[in-house]
């Protein structure tokens, strides 16, 4: 979930849900099933017609509306499915389609009859686009992400008369409500997603070609794994993102990037590691909240380890190797600046001691920390080393 470009898995197989939706919309159009799926409030009183609240998104009665929906599925739908996972993409699409139908029926009951009576997948496209509160990898100096669904709404009105404007607006409002957390109680839990993805059907579809079920990024089944020291994975992995449970059991410098010794890690390296890991935590699913306490405890344990440095005798002006991105991130979450937090960690070697220095205001922003333990950090109070 880090770029607009399709990930590598897309070049090997197509996303299952979006591709099947394209086939389904085309088949229903050829069969002429659009009128029987349109959102008709007067028919919803019959028990067998309640399905229209959901299936109104699958029917089309106008060719321009169908072509626009089909065009957006391989462009927008594939990207969303790759970054949400197939199961979460299907779940979100169904929830937003149902919310759009209910909102349209509500407006029709209030006297706005044009809010219902149509069909088409465009309201779901608008809802999914508006429901993304932030777009990872969105290029800088371009249109703001919140403007995209409104531009798509205007484009739809220019190119097609189906569905009606109020029904499209209902889809957009449903997406905005989703982004605001109105449907959070309907979200699939990480445990539920894991159980579904470990099922026989999902595992079979995940290995199919050319259509493939994509796992949910960041789910328990997608957690990073730890590689033995000296063994590099086939695809590059960012430093400091290997499993934190390996810290107490592996060499202290096994997490450094290839070619960098303990004394060659500069402030820019640490900041670049934090920048890489930042979007991953920002867009993480609730699974990270459940593991937050465990990661904090392991980070504190790792900070208490006294790593002896075997290197040259010359003084190197760089942060201590024990200053890791995770500990810096813990202090950042507490509201401390990055530079001062790193200096305090290098001076004390402990998270608790760093917090004490920062709270008392003893850390100088211009301080440099040597690799040797006896080399004091330059603080405002010369008595602190």
UniProtKB/Swiss-Prot annotation:
- Its gene name is Rhbdd3
Major subcellular site: membrane
Native organism: Rattus norvegicus (Rat)
Q: Which SUPFAM superfamilies match?
A: Rhomboid-like (SSF144091), UBA-like (SSF46934)
Looking at the UniProt record for this protein, which Gene Ontology cellular component terms does it annotate, in alphabetical order?
membrane
**Keyword annotations from UniProtKB, A to Z:** Membrane, Transmembrane, Transmembrane helix
Record-annotated membrane-spanning stretches: 13-33, 58-78, 93-113, 146-166, 168-188
> In this record, what's one Pfam family?
UBA
Q: Which InterPro entries match?
A: Peptidase_S54_rhomboid_dom, Rhomboid-like_sf, UBA, UBA-like_sf
**Presence of keyword Transmembrane helix:** yes
Put simply, this protein is called: Rhomboid domain-containing protein 3
Specify the domain of life of the species encoding this protein: Eukaryota
Cysteine pairs forming cystine bridges in this chain are: none
């Amino acid at each position: 979930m880090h770029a607009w470009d399709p990930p590598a898995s897309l070049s090997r197989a197509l996303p299952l849900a979006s591709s099947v939706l394209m086939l389904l919309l085309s088949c229903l159009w050829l069969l002429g099933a659009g009128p029987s799926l349109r959102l008709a409030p007067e028919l919803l009183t019959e028990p067998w017609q309640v399905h229209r609240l959901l299936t109104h998104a699958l029917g089309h009665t106008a060719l321009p509306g169908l072509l626009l929906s089909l065009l957006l599925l391989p462009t927008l739908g594939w990207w969303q499915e790759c970054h949400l996972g197939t199961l979460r993409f299907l779940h979100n699409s169904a929830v937003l389609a149902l919310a759009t139908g209910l909102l349209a029926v509500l407006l029709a009951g209030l006297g706005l009859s044009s809010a219902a009576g149509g069909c088409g997948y465009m309201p779901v496209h608008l809802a999914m686009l508006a429901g993304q509160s932030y777009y990872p990898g969105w290029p800088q100096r371009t249109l703001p992400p919140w403007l995209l669904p409104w531009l798509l709404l205007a484009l739809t009105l220019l190119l097609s008369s189906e569905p009606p404007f109020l029904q499209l607006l209902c889809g957009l409002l449903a997406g905005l409500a989703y982004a605001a957390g109105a449907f959070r109680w309907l979200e699939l839990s990480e445990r539920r997603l894991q159980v579904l993805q470990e099922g026989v059907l999902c595992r079979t579809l995940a290995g199919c070609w050319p259509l493939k079920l994509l796992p949910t990024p960041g789910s328990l089944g997608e957690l990073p794994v730890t590689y033995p020291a000296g063994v590099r994975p086939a695809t590059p992995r960012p430093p400091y993102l290997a499993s934190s449970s390996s810290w107490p059991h592996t060499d202290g410098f096994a997490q450094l990037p290839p070619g960098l010794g303990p004394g060659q890690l500069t402030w820019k390296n640490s900041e670049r590691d934090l920048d890489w890991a930042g979007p991953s935590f920002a867009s993480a699913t609730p699974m990270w909240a459940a593991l937050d306490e465990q990661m904090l405890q392991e980070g504190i344990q790792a900070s208490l380890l006294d790593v002896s440095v075997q290197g040259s005798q010359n003084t190197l002006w760089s942060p201590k190797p024990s200053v890791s991105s995770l500990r810096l991130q813990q202090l950042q979450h507490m509201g401390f600046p990055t530079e001062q937090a790193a200096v305090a960690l290098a001076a004390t070697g402990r998270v608790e001691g760093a917090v004490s220095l920062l709270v008392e205001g003893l850390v100088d922003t211009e301080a440099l920390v040597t690799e040797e333990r006896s080399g004091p950090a330059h603080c405002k109070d010369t008595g602190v080393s």
